[in-house]
Amino acid sequence: MITAVYPGTFDPLTRGHEDLVRRAAALFDKVVVAVAYSRNKKPFFNIDERVEIAREVLGHYPNVEVRSFGGLLRDFVREQNGRVIVRGLRAMSDFEYEFQMAGMNRHLLPDVETLFMTPSDQYQFISGTIVREIAQLGGDVSKFVFPSVERWLQAKAKARREQAETE
């Protein structure tokens, strides 16, 4: 059985992320979507929310699991008996960073391969950062995220706007 691990912050999970998960699920026996705590970032959604959102969107895939992790990816991949790390590349600008990370992961996990996947054409431009910004400004994000994610975004953006108004 070959297990692939797809790590990311998924803040929020977009249609582009789901596209990669769907395609990876067709290639591997098991795909673990590894939602990172992201210590170096200030996430819009907390870890529990991001895991719940991912489970809502991806729960219908029988060979996909969603889990959170907060330590080294190396340790998480070992715990999951992972053989492959899946990474998405939207543009050449992503490649340099991802190439360096793949090299480091190869050093730390010599038995694990990194598989770079490019998004389907209609998702190449989608990023969680842009989706969050559009949502915070009250824009329509329905083409970029699933309806359940859109509801999460709208509720969180509204709560943040209301909080800002009272401060």
Swiss-Prot record:
It catalyses: (R)-4'-phosphopantetheine + ATP + H(+) = 3'-dephospho-CoA + diphosphate. GO terms for cellular component: cytoplasm. It is found in: Cytoplasm. The record marks H17 as: Transition state stabilizer. ATP binds at T9, F10, H17, G88, L89, R90, E98, Y123, Q124, F125, I126, S127, G128, T129. One of its GO terms (molecular function) is pantetheine-phosphate adenylyltransferase activity. CDD domains: PPAT. Disulfide bonds: none annotated. Its cofactor is Mg(2+). InterPro entries: Cyt_trans-like, PPAT, Rossmann-like_a/b/a_fold. Its EC number is 2.7.7.3. The keyword Protein biosynthesis does not apply. One of its GO terms (biological process) is coenzyme A biosynthetic process. SUPFAM superfamilies: Nucleotidylyl transferase (SSF52374). Keywords: ATP-binding, Coenzyme A biosynthesis, Cytoplasm, Magnesium, Nucleotide-binding, Nucleotidyltransferase, Transferase. Substrate binds at T9, K41, L73, R87. Reversibly transfers an adenylyl group from ATP to 4'-phosphopantetheine, yielding dephospho-CoA (dPCoA) and pyrophosphate. PANTHER family: PHOSPHOPANTETHEINE ADENYLYLTRANSFERASE (PTHR21342:SF1). Belongs to the bacterial CoaD family. Homohexamer. NCBIfam families: coaD_prev_kdtB, cyt_tran_rel. This is Phosphopantetheine adenylyltransferase. It comes from Bordetella avium (strain 197N). The lineage of its organism: Bacteria, Pseudomonadati, Pseudomonadota, Betaproteobacteria, Burkholderiales.
